[in-house]
Amino acid sequence: MAFQVKIHQIRAFVEVARQGSIRGASRMLNMSQPALSKSIQELEEGLAAQLFFRRSKGVTLTDAGESFYQHASLILEELRAAQEDIRQRQGQLAGQINIGMGASISRSLMPTVISRFHQQHPQVKVRIMEGQLVSMINELRQGELDFTINTYYQGPYDHEFTFEKLLEKQFAIFCRPGHPAIGARSIKQLLDYSWTMPTPHGSYYKHLSELLDDQAQTPQVGVVCETFSACISLVAKSDFLSILPEEMGCDPLHGQGLVMLPVSEILPKATYYLIQRRDSRQTPLTASLITQFRRECGYLQS
C-alpha cells in the first residue's frame, strides 16, 4: 500500500523548516520534541527521502526538503483558506487576509482602503507585507500571500500569476531642499551627482534603467536600497538624488524634505497590477477587499 502523508506530518515538517530546529518547532506546535522527531522520521521513511540535514545548531532543508516544502506550505495555506471560506459563507465574517503592497501603494492607496475595510470587518486580521514583487514571489507561490498590488516588468512569472492592471503613477526626480542640483533642466545635467535607487530587480526600476541606458542617460547609482523608506531618507537628508513617484512631493511624512526637479524629459509611468496565483480561489472577504482596491484605483484614475 502506498504511503499516505498525514496532515499532522505536514504541519510538523513545515514548522520545523520555518523554525530551523526541532526545539523551536515543538514550542510553536505545543508538542514534545520526541513526538515531533518521530513525526518527521516517519515522514522521511514514508517518502524514502531525507528532508533535513541535522546539525548541532539546528536543521536545514535538503534539496528534496526544499521541493517538498513548496508543496507542503501551500497545502496548509490552501487548507486554512478553505476553512475560512466555509466559515465566511456561513456568515462568520472573521479570519485573516495576507496581502503584499508596493511601497508607493502603501503610502497612497492602502490607508484609505484598509481603514474602511477594517471598519466594516473589525474581526478580520489583515497582514501587510511591503516591498517589490521580487521580494514576495515565494510567499505568493506558497499561498502565504493572497494577492499583491505591485509593478511588474517582463519576467518569468506570466505562467504562474494573473496580472490585472489597476492604475498608473507618474515618477519624477527628487532632491532635498537647497540641493545644488535645483535649477537643472535635463537628466544629463544631473549625471555627475550621487544617486540612490530602490533595487531594480523585475520592476519599474528595471524598466527605467533599461530605458535610460538606451538614451545614454544612465545615472551612476552608488547606493541601492532594499526599502523605499531608506531611499527617501537618503534623498531628504543628504545630497543623493532619486527617482520616486510624483506624489512623494505631497506626502505628509516626507513632502517637506523633498523637492521635485522639473527636467524636460518625461519619465515612464509605472503600471501597478493586482497579482494573484493563477490557481488561487478567493474567500468572500478577500474578494470584497480586492473590490475595494479596484474602486479606489478607479477614483484615483478618474
PLM features: what roles do these ranges have?
Residues 181-182, 187, 193-215, 282-291, ...:
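Secondary-structure junction motif
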Residues 94-155, 225:
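Central regulatory/effector-binding core of bacterial HTH transcription factors
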Residues 132-145, 151, 201-259:
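Hydrophobic hinge/microswitch elements
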Residues 157-164, 169, 229-278:
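Beta-alpha-beta core module
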Residues 161-195:
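Flexible hinge/capping segments at coil-to-helix
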Residues 14-32:
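Short helix-boundary/capping micro-motifs
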Residues 109, 174, 181-182, 259-302:
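A late-sequence structural motif
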Residues 44-63:
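A short LG(V/I)-centered, amphipathic sequence patch enriched
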